[in-house]
């Protein structure tokens, strides 16, 4: 194991944002008919020199001191065979664990509460009523609510002013009441933020924050105002992003559980949004006591505990539904909602009836979904089983022969 933040040399992925973080290199050589395997840590960054989009250079200090660990093991799962599964079980003793990963098996009832376009469709105290409603129908099973549009005039307004909690939705007072009272019903709350794009109404918007590509603006999403690319390296090196998260922390204290970082990895804020930048972003979030979650199915493998495109099975392209590595799922099925779910019509690894995978639905406006009954039925049909199994670590994996039902 290594904590290298390097992107690796040959790894392919559909997006950046930490998806290419290669921490160990394996090299196979053959000499006089004898093959040998060597393992080595990838490069570490200590004091990294970076240049923002306007040509200004900075030196950014290390995220943490370089580390590598080795473990040697025997038949850990007692199946009379020593193979990669025994190595994976032993690897858990030395690997990194995403912050607050132990919460994941308890989060049975994920959903999005949506506010958009200044309409405050789901004020914070209405969301609290819905928390109580779901708690009654699930005997208090854990809930995880993503407040998409908590700030400014709602979703994709006012980025990246993280502390601009929307007044129409109830302001900081009602948001804290939602989180404090909701916790009594087993609910945890997080917010949707953006570290790549900003909007002209944001207080953080400035010429220094704008990313320039050959002198031109970098553009993002544009369904209300036109999103303008943030100069992510400037934002990082100058401590601007970190200070905005700190301002939010002053308002919400310890009430909030997680942060969802939208679109990170689509290269709006820099030419790379690489694993090092991603680890820096994650540390700003986890240092404030917030769990890290993100959008893309393969994004931020090191720190993220939830990938929206992996769990919202009918949203986004079917080829981008999450991590499909058998080894990764063996290691971390209990730590993440980041896997290709059980959705057989997609084919391939999406046919996963044993471990399942989170199947996200909503009833508070996201994607126009408003069917509460369907939400509850889906929890019991798909997600209760998935979450039950996440309480246990995988120790023995056997691929059976497929059966064709006739």
Locate each region found by the language model.
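Aromatic-lined carbohydrate-binding/catalytic grooves of carbohydrate-active enzymes
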Residues: 101-267
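Carbohydrate-recognition beta-sandwich/jelly-roll modules
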Residues: 1-144, 149, 167, 185-188
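Exposed, low-structure sequence patches enriched in small/polar residues
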Residues: 264-265, 282-284, 296
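Short, contiguous acidic/charged loop-to-helix segments that flank catalytic cores in large enzymes
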Residues: 269-272
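Glycan-recognition surfaces
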Residues: 200, 204-243, 290-406
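Alpha-helix-loop-beta-strand connector modules within alpha/beta enzyme cores
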Residues: 178-182, 281-290
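Charged helix-capping and loop-helix junction motifs
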Residues: 274-280
């Amino acid at each position: 194991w290594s904590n290298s933040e390097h992107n690796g040399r040959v790894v392919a992925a559909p997006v950046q944002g930490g998806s290419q973080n290669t921490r160990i290199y394996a090299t196979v050589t053959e000499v006089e008919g004898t093959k040998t395997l060597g393992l080595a840590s990838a490069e570490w960054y200590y004091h990294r020199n970076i240049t923002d989009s306007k040509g200004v250079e900075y030196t950014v200090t290390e995220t943490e001191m370089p580390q590598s660990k080795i473990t040697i093991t025997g038949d850990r799962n007692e199946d009379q065979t020593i193979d990669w599964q025994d190595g994976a079980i032993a690897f858990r003793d030395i690997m990194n664990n995403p912050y607050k990963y132990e919460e994941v098996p308890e989060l049975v009832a994920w959903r999005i509460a949506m506010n958009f376009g200044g309409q405050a469709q789901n004020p914070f105290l209405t969301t609290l009523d819905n928390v109580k409603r779901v708690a009654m129908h699930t005997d208090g099973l854990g809930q995880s609510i993503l407040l998409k549009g908590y700030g400014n005039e709602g979703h994709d307004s006012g980025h990246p002013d993280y502390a601009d909690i929307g007044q129409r939705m109830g302001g900081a007072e009602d948001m804290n009441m939602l989180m404090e009272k909701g916790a009594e019903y087993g609910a945890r709350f997080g917010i949707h933020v953006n570290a790549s794009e900003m909007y002209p109404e944001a207080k953080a918007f400035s010429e220094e924050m704008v990313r320039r590509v050959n002198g031109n603006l970098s553009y993002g999403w544009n369904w209300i105002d036109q999103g303008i690319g943030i100069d992510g390296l400037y934002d990082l090196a100058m401590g601007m992003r970190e200070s905005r998260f700190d301002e939010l922390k002053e308002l919400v204290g310890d009430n909030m559980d997680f942060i969802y970082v939208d679109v990170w990895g689509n290269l709006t804020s820099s030419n790379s949004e690489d694993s090092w930048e991603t680890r820096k972003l994650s540390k700003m979030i986890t240092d404030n006591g917030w769990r890290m979650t993100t959008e893309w199915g393969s994004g931020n493998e090191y720190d993220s505990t939830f990938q929206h495109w992996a769990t919202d099975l009918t949203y986004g392209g079917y080829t981008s539904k999450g991590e499909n590595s058998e080894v990764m799922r063996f290691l971390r099925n209990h730590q993440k909602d980041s896997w290709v779910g059980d959705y057989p019509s997609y084919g391939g690894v999406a046919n996963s009836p044993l471990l399942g995978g989170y199947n996200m639905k909503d009833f508070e406006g996201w994607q126009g979904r408003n069917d509460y009954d369907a939400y509850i039925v889906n929890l019991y049909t798909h997600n209760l089983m998935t979450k039950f199994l996440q309480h246990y670590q995988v120790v023995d994996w056997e691929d059976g022969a497929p059966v064709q039902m006739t």
